[in-house]
Amino acid sequence: MNKQERLGMSVYLYYNRDARKLYKYGDVHYHSRRLRYLVIYVNKEDIVSVSKEIKHLKFVKDVRLSAIDDIDQDFVGNLYR
């Protein structure tokens, strides 16, 4: 059984009432009602197509992809670089 590679994205909304419309695009991990954004996890191979589709929805203000793949996660010896 292989582990499914997933990537997170932050979706900023104009209104919180539209948050439930995004449940079909991926797994909603967190919904901040005060700051009006959601954190959604999507399969890594589908992230480009899903983010383009979500950006074109009229109730979405902004979509930001997670940068966890770009960050060097080898923390041993980072103080001396």
Curated annotation (Swiss-Prot):
Disulfide bond residue pairs: none
Q: Which UniProt keywords apply?
A: Cytoplasm
Q: Give the UniProt subcellular location, in the record's own words.
A: Cytoplasm
Keyword Secreted on entry: no
- InterPro entries with a match to the protein in the record: DUF2129 (IPR016979)
Naming one, the record's GO cellular component terms include: cytoplasm
| A Pfam family it matches | DUF2129
Q: Which family does it belong to?
A: Belongs to the UPF0298 family.
- The protein depicted here goes by the name UPF0298 protein SAG1583
Identify the taxonomic lineage of the organism of origin: Bacteria, Bacillati, Bacillota, Bacilli, Lactobacillales
